[in-house]
């Protein structure tokens, strides 16, 4: 009998074991689609980014005009730029939903997969931040100034570190050039880490909505889940097309249509919408170093989630108290996002401070406490 090449060829065998004959739980829901959607987002971002890089000039005197040139003179340049800019927003929507699913269904129990995922998130945030600086508009310049300046809060090495990142004593040509380099390089590192993420995931197999062992009830990934993923792809591409064609600038900041001017500060400096929750946490602490540490910890706290898991059950399907806390955390994060986009005045300062305290309380106190309490109730 002839052997199947996909099962014997060294390269095809890897693809086959990852995407075709992969044993997958029968009951994974639509929430498990976001991993593949993130892969699609990454491919779209790399491809559109490559085409934009062909026409972009990383020089402060011509960066803004090169972006205008892309939108006006390059064939379908406006479309490529709109897809790239709005693709970033969809990328973050997908990754936040992916993380939320991981928290809800206890996927963080697979520590290696989870930790690599957090590193990917940090790199994605770094990529988006340096990418936002490239058009060299007002918000690009001042956003970069404010965020990089935060590093000066670090004792002893702070000022030296800021000047090292800037490549001088202020944000200048050297800064833009290196940010462009990082923006070009980081997505490929993210792609490599995605492979490691999948490697660790396939060591254990996928989690499922029940949180129970599913080894006795699995089906091949193709055709069942490959077609399911394909449906997700079509929905994502439809949303991206609608965003890019009908409301391309709805998620951006109007200040970025003004070329960067170091002499004029925008009335309200703020990052893109997907960083606003972390920005609100940063602003809610009056001390500069404290704010920087809170900002870093708002993401790094995800690394503590597996260690703070106290429940005997893996997911929240049959844990009503923790379920309530989870949805309160989601609401809290939305409130932080809203506050981050508001000016620094009352009542937003107080709301931001309360929301920041509760954000950390959920992870460090309330979730572990609720898990312990539910264990006690199970023993009654």
From Swiss-Prot:
The chain crosses the membrane at residues 34-54, 78-99, 114-134, 179-199, 227-247, 289-309, 321-341, 348-368. The keyword Phosphoprotein does not apply. Keywords: Electron transport, Heme, Iron, Membrane, Metal-binding, Mitochondrion, Mitochondrion inner membrane, Respiratory chain, Transmembrane, Transmembrane helix, Transport, Ubiquinone. It is a multi-pass membrane protein. Heme b b562 binds at residues 84, 183. One of its GO terms (cellular component) is mitochondrial inner membrane. One of its GO terms (biological process) is mitochondrial electron transport, ubiquinol to cytochrome c. PROSITE patterns: CYTB_CTER (PS51003), CYTB_NTER (PS51002). Gene3D superfamilies: Cytochrome Bc1 Complex, Chain C. Signal peptide: none annotated. Its cofactor is heme b. Pfam families: Cytochrom_B_C, Cytochrome_B. Its main location: mitochondrion. A ubiquinone binds at residue 202. Belongs to the cytochrome b family. Component of the ubiquinol-cytochrome c reductase complex (complex III or cytochrome b-c1 complex) that is part of the mitochondrial respiratory chain. The b-c1 complex mediates electron transfer from ubiquinol to cytochrome c. Contributes to the generation of a proton gradient across the mitochondrial membrane that is then used for ATP synthesis. The cytochrome bc1 complex contains 3 respiratory subunits (MT-CYB, CYC1 and UQCRFS1), 2 core proteins (UQCRC1 and UQCRC2) and probably 6 low-molecular weight proteins. Heme 1 (or BL or b562) is low-potential and absorbs at about 562 nm, and heme 2 (or BH or b566) is high-potential and absorbs at about 566 nm. This is Cytochrome b. It comes from Urogymnus polylepis.
